[in-house]
Structure formats: C-alpha cells, structure tokens
Amino acid sequence: EKTDKVDARMIAEYAFRHQDKIKPYNPQTESIQELRFWLKTHDALKESRKSLINLSRSMKHVPRTLQKSIDELTEQLKRTDKKIKELLKEDQELASNAKLAMSVPGISYVTTAAILVDTRNFTRFTDARKYANHTGCVPHKHSSGTSVYRRPHVSKASNRYINSLLTEGSVSLMTHNKEMREYADKKRREGKSNGCIINNIRNKTLHRLFAVIRNNRIFEKNYRCELKKEHHDVLIHHNALFE
C-alpha cells in the first residue's frame, strides 16, 4: 500500500531512528547571499580578464578595442574587490569572523569571503578536520589485504574552488613566510613531495583558522591555541598519511 499517509509515517520512523544524524537546515542569510553574489562576480570578471590578456599576448599588435575591454574589466574588478572588502569590514554579521580569519597567514580576503560563504559564517562547519575533508585537504587510503594498495589521495568530490584558494595561499607562504619556508625546506630534505608539503600547509592553515574562530582571538605567531586533543591527533594522522 502506498499513500501519502503511509509515506509520511515511513519518513517519520526513519527520521526517529536516525535522529542522531539529523543536521538542522541552516538557510543563507542576506549577508551571505550578497557576499556570494559579489564573490561570483569577482571570479567571472577575473576569468574574463585573464582570457583577454592571454589572447592579447598571442598578438603582435593588440587592437584598441581589446585593450579597452581589458581596461574596463580591470576597473570593474577593482570595484568588485572594494565591495567585497567593504562587506567583510562593515557588515555586522560578517565583520568579526572576517577579521579573525584574515589574521591567519595564508588567508586572503578572497579566501576569507569564499570560506564564509561556504561555511555560512562558520555555522555549517565548526570543525577543522571535517572542513579539511570537505575541501580536499585530507588524504584517503585505499588498500585491501596485501595485494591492493594505492598511494593516499584527496577526494575528487571536494570543494575545488576553496582548495585552489588554499593552495595559492600555501604556495605564497612557502615563498614569503619564514616559518613555512623553513618547514618546506625541512620536508624537502626528508624527501617529501611538493604536493605533500603544500597539503600539510593547507591543513595547518585550516586548523589555525578554525582555532582563531573557536577561541575568538586574533592569530599571533608565538601563541599556540589549546587545540582539543582529538583535533591535534587528527592533524598528526593527516600529515602522517601523506608522509
């Protein structure tokens, strides 16, 4: 028998049996929706400008109309950048966490905006370990017995946009941040691959980010947040998988 009444009962029974796994729906606020709009606009303008610049480099003589289009996109991109920064600084809902996030080395204002949108201002995700998995910063093992083994790899179903932003930040840290540059040099001497090093730095960055949000405290170089033991153990485990 299949009726609306029977279906409703089955759904209710299923929900009751699995109530420990229920995640309440968390709708996007107006601030998050506006930030998402300007972030998408920023990315669209950036990609369009990049395409035209690449096109111009393949020409001996750049047409005036093409250069004009590049200049217009550059100006639009500047205005969009300004709008995103204003939202992060002045919006009552976003400003506090945005300030904390941007204090972490490797987290730019664009990365901050993207993570605020993706986590819905750190309400959709509150745990660095889970978010690292969501963004493809956690290697997964694939083995069975003694005959099946693949090198640990990150999930292809991850949020690649956030992953790419974290990668950009990690590469920048390896060049400009003394602590991370020394860390990268040490790992290279140990024979670690560049991908492994970048992934470890992405993980470190995310754990620092969620720590400052959790503790409501600006990141300080010489301050070590008291991470929960399970978070610390998981980070060590993640690093060990890639090493």
Where are these regions (language model features)?
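Hydrophobic (often cysteine-bearing) scaffold residues that line and stabilize catalytic clefts
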Residues: T41, Q76, S158, I162, ...
